[in-house]
Amino acid sequence: MTLTFKPLESYREDFSFRNSPAAIARFPFPFPEDQYMYSVNLEPAVSRDPGSVFEHQFDVDEHYVSEMAERARVLELDPGRCLVMPHMAQAAWDTLAMLMEHLARDYPQHFRLTRQGDAWHWQNLALGIDQRFTFGDPASLPCEPLEYITRQMQGDFAVLDQRDGDLFMDAGMVTCPADWSLRFDAGMSFKQWHSPVPMAHQMGVFDRALKYLLNIQVGAPVRRLNWTLTINPRLDTSPETYHEWGNDRGKVTPDNVGRLVHLRVELQLMARLPRSNALLFGIRTYLISLDELVSNPAWAQRLHRVMRDLPDPIADYKGITRYRQTLVDWLRRFDPEA
């Protein structure tokens, strides 16, 4: 698949973000059934379906340049969105190495990496970056290594320290979260940062997930899909910016639901870092408006059924309740059996 980047689009203010027909076709629709309930739903992150979001371990798409501009803007306003605790320095270099290696291998027309021992040469042709540096020496980069590489990667990243039979969120770059804060969750254990999720704890979902994640081996990453809904194509729906987007849920009407409401899907990747034994948790976000989504009749029909029958506690947690009935009524026309 030839990768072409779209001209600069915005994820705020005028919200000029749109998906091309090709981007719609490869959107990772997250519902395999007409009903949704929490599950671990992890699978090996092996390459499949050429051209899809599952072809490469770290997906780069047409929105790359726009997303990197959005990340830079968020960091300019709030540098604390990137955090690395002192004991995570090796894991930060580990992350840089993994991301550079994958980008250069999977997208050689846009990224290049050459190495001679610790002397590395990185070229990001998409963003016009040409950097020679010494691996392991932070003074040879313009900023801390985790920040440096994640300023060039779509999606958020948490780097989890594994100790005492648990995982701790001790580093990360989070500028496009679905209503959570790295600043707040920093240092928390796996169950602590998942504590707001309703129903799943009683079902044992997180006990099973933690046991699985602790045993992930180097070279055997796993992935899963997660989802929510977002009003407008806004990437930064963080608690820190709630004053900018919190009221948007009250603006949904029968006339604008297709334009305003976006299905927000996270392709979550968990990969063991070889030098530090930390776990890299990638959260790659995809947005699609309902107007775009219903161009696929099967998706439109299924989304109607999922939203109609979604358990109330899950709808509340995902922030859907306020406009849920408007959404279901609008989607009903796309379900022949409704």
Curated annotation (Swiss-Prot):
It holds the Pfam family HODM_asu-like. This is Heme-dependent oxidative N-demethylase alpha subunit. Dimethylamine binds at residue 266. Its EC number is 1.14.13.238. Component of the heme-dependent oxidative N-demethylase (HODM) enzyme, that catalyzes the NADPH-dependent oxidation of dimethylamine (DMA) to methylamine (MA) and formaldehyde. Functions in bacterial methylated amine catabolism, linking alkylamine oxidation to the tetrahydrofolate C1 pool. The alpha subunit of HODM binds heme, oxygen and DMA, and serves as the site of the oxidative N-demethylase activity. The lineage of its organism: Bacteria, Pseudomonadati, Pseudomonadota, Gammaproteobacteria, Pseudomonadales. Traditionally, PAS domains are known for signal transduction, sensing various stimuli. Ortmayer et al. reveal that PAS domains can also support enzymatic activity. The alpha subunit of HODM contains a heme-binding PAS-scaffold that serves as the site of the oxidative N-demethylase activity. It comes from the Bacteria. Heme b binds at residues 38, 194, 226, 317-318. GO terms for molecular function: metal ion binding; oxidoreductase activity. Keywords: Heme, Iron, Metal-binding, NADP, Oxidoreductase. It catalyses: dimethylamine + NADPH + O2 + H(+) = methylamine + formaldehyde + NADP(+) + H2O. The heme-dependent oxidative N-demethylase (HODM) is a heterotetramer composed of a catalytic alpha subunit, a FMN/2Fe-2S-dependent oxidoreductase beta subunit, a gamma subunit with putative aminotransferase activity, and a delta subunit of unknown function. InterPro entries: HODM_asu-like (IPR021848). The active site is at 224 (proton donor).
